[in-house]
């Protein structure tokens, strides 16, 4: 985030709620329509705010897009950390991501991954934020995998960080195939096959 944004006065509770609503609505619109297909006017209408409010929180579209990237990454990581820290965390994680893919047929792709093709080559700041989001996501998966190592359910010679990156790459590739083919089968097959291979001792 740029210095101008970070140096702004602290938001009031009401202001924070308004800003959060703008970001949530922007995230939904961008996931549905893409970055190029979403205007500040679209977001203003969806969030039910005035033009002056919109400009107060987000003077330009780049700042809003960056906030959406942070929001999507944080939402994904928080949700998955909660599941991975539960009993049978990895199994619960597997069920969660596959259920979501079946429900949506991967329409729109991954909330974070779908932004890569739109922004990574043209916007260095956005690319850095997306990369940071994936790093946090991989770390959350790695933390969840460590319980399997502790229980002896994964070979000791497999590094949890490496396996987390592999799972994340498999997840993203599986979502892409499911999106193209219009069904969740490729996604489910990819995740289940990798988990089965990783658990072999």
Predicted segments with their positions:
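Amphipathic alpha-helical segments used for helix-helix packing
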Residues: 65, 92, 104-128
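Helix-turn-helix
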Residues: 2, 21, 25-63, 67
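Hydrophobic alpha-helical segments that form the core
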Residues: 113, 158-177, 189, 193-196
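N-terminal intrinsically disordered/low-complexity leader segments
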Residues: 1-17
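Amphipathic C-terminal alpha-helical segment
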Residues: 103, 147, 168-185, 197-201
């Amino acid at each position: 985030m740029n210095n101008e944004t970070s140096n702004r006065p602290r938001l009031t509770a009401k202001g924070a709620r308004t800003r959060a609503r703008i970001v949530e609505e922007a995230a939904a619109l961008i996931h549905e329509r893409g970055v190029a297909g979403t205007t500040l006017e679209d977001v203003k209408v969806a969030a039910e705010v005035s033009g002056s409010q919109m400009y107060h929180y987000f003077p330009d579209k780049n700042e809003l897009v960056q906030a959406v990237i942070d929001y999507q990454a944080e939402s994904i990581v928080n949700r998955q950390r909660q599941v991975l820290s539960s009993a049978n965390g990895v199994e619960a994680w597997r069920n969660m991501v596959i259920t979501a893919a079946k429900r949506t047929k991967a329409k729109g792709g991954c909330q974070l991954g779908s932004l890569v093709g739109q922004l990574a080559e043209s916007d260095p700041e956005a690319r850095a934020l997306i990369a940071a989001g994936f790093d946090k996501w991989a770390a959350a998966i790695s933390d969840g995998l460590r319980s399997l190592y502790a229980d002896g359910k994964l070979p000791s010679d497999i590094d949890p960080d490496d396996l987390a990156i592999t799972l994340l790459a498999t997840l993203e590739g599986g979502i892409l195939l499911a999106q193209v083919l219009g069904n969740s089968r490729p996604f489910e097959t990819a995740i289940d096959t990798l988990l089965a291979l990783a658990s072999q001792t």
